[in-house]
């Protein structure tokens, strides 16, 4: 068994798929995974793959041409999951895709296709949740800017940003992914862009969560006022609003700090 390993970014995953396909070893004899690799398995050869933009672009063109735009979006969402087995899930989906074309998207009876849809749905659901759960703090540093921190399981910044770009087109805002040291920056009335933050920038921007904002007290007051003690149902609340979303929500801060 040959195990191809790569970084969890999209270009690396697509390059890894290109190398596995080009090896001609056969799908039964290869496995793909992202790094870092945990425990090494006996009788496996591990092959690290460096990202190559030309090879990644070649895979992208093949997907769009032979399977279609919907399949490319599915592949993109799976890659954004940042699961260690994401490259392998995409690779096995593409085995069917390059054989059956656009019909592959309707072959949910095949485990490889169903698994790809399942992972992409998890990523989409998390992105949609952040549409509702993101909270902005108003920061004044020469000019007003709205700043929000999130800690998503998947890399959903590029999926969340278009929603707020449409809702807040004339505002300066930032959404920071604390887990990946990435940020989406939206200048007022201009397109947003994705940037990687330096350690100094991360440290400075982390202070925004400790600033005082009167709207935070309004959120907390609203949250307390609408609660009915006799109908308190924490289990139901956790179902609709899982705990890992609450770290950056002001209405839950006093409960998390106590």
Locations of regions flagged by a protein language model:
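N-terminal ordered "arm"
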Residues: 1-53
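Conserved aromatic-histidine-acidic binding/catalytic patches
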Residues: 2-9, 47, 111, 145-156, ...
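Short coil/turn segments at secondary-structure boundaries
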Residues: 73-78, 178-179, 232-238
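Acidic, Ser/Thr-rich peripheral helices and adjacent loops at domain boundaries
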Residues: 46-55, 190-204
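Internal, well-folded beta-alpha domain core
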Residues: 103-196
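Charged, alpha-helical interface segments at or near domain boundaries
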Residues: 33-131, 135
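Long, compositionally biased intrinsically disordered terminal regions
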Residues: 172, 183-184, 188-190, 203-258
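Short, hydrophobic/amphipathic alpha-helical patches that form generic packing surfaces
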Residues: 13-23, 92-96, 159-166, 217-224
């Amino acid at each position: 068994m040959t195990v191809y390993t790569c970084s969890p970014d999209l270009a690396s995953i697509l390059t890894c798929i290109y190398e596995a396909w080009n090896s001609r070893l056969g799908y039964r004899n290869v496995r793909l995974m992202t790094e870092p690799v945990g425990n090494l398995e006996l009788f496996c050869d591990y092959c690290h793959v460096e990202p190559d933009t030309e090879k990644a672009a070649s895979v992208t063109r093949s997907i769009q041409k032979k399977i279609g735009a919907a399949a490319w979006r599915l592949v993109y969402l799976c890659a954004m999951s940042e699961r260690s087995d994401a490259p392998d899930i995409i690779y096995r989906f593409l085995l069917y895709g390059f054989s059956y074309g656009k019909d592959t998207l309707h072959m949910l009876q095949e485990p490889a296709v169903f698994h790809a849809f399942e992972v992409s749905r998890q990523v989409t659901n998390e992105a949609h949740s952040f549409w509702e759960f993101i909270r902005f703090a108003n920061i004044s540093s020469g000019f007003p800017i709205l700043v929000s921190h999130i800690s998503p399981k998947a890399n959903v910044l590029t999926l969340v940003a278009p929603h707020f770009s449409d809702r807040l087109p004339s505002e300066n805002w930032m959404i920071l992914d604390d887990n990946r040291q990435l940020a989406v920056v939206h200048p007022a009335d201009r397109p947003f862009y994705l940037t990687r933050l330096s350690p100094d920038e991360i440290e400075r921007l982390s202070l925004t969560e400790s600033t005082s904002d009167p709207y935070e007290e309004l959120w907390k007051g609203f949250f307390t006022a609408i609660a009915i003690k006799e109908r308190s149902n924490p289990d139901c609340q956790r179902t609709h609003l899982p705990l890992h979303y609450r770290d950056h929500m002001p209405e839950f801060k006093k409960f998390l700090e106590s």
